[in-house]
């Protein structure tokens, strides 16, 4: 078992190679948050840790993983133990650009992965309390790609809840 790098009543942080630290803890978790090296540059610190998604699957039921589209596509076979659910885009204020011939990267993807039945995964509808007050009236719609919908009417309040956007600042 490793010695925690930091610990208080709410959180315990361990520092080290994930592939060694997680198995040594001897526990299973509901959610894992990972931000691995993407393995996209020749920099010495940017080396993909082979096998880590499979180790994570042995100890976690769900996972948020930060990365780039290239990282996920290049390593898609390593995520075979996981089911992909959704992704959000984290828009960064200051982007990074190590290549002059590409767009300056001002975002990263955070993708949600899970194992087992979706009904057994803890998920809460993500909302934010910054809705603009308005009244919406929707007419009944014919069957299209979302199915038939009846008429709807609702009023939102200033500062009330709304679904969170998939692009997060």
Language model regions located:
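Core catalytic lobe of class I
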Residues: 2-169
């Amino acid at each position: 078992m490793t010695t925690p790098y930091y610990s208080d009543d709410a959180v315990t942080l361990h520092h080290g190679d994930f592939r060694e630290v997680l198995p040594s803890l001897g526990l299973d978790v509901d959610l894992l948050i990972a931000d691995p090296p993407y393995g996209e540059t020749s920099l010495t610190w940017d080396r993909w840790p082979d096998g880590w998604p499979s180790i994570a699957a042995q100890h976690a039921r769900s996972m948020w993983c930060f990365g780039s589209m290239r990282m996920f596509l290049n390593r898609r076979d390593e995520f075979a133990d996981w089911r992909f659910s959704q992704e959000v885009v984290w828009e960064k204020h200051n982007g990074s650009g190590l290549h002059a011939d590409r767009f300056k990267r001002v975002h990263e993807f955070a993708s949600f992965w899970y194992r087992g039945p979706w009904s057994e995964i803890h998920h809460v509808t993500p909302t934010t309390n910054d809705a603009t007050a308005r009244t919406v009236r929707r007419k009944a719609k014919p069957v299209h790609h979302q199915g038939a919908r009846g008429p709807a009417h609702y009023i939102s309040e200033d500062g009330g809840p709304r679904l969170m956007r998939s692009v997060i600042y």
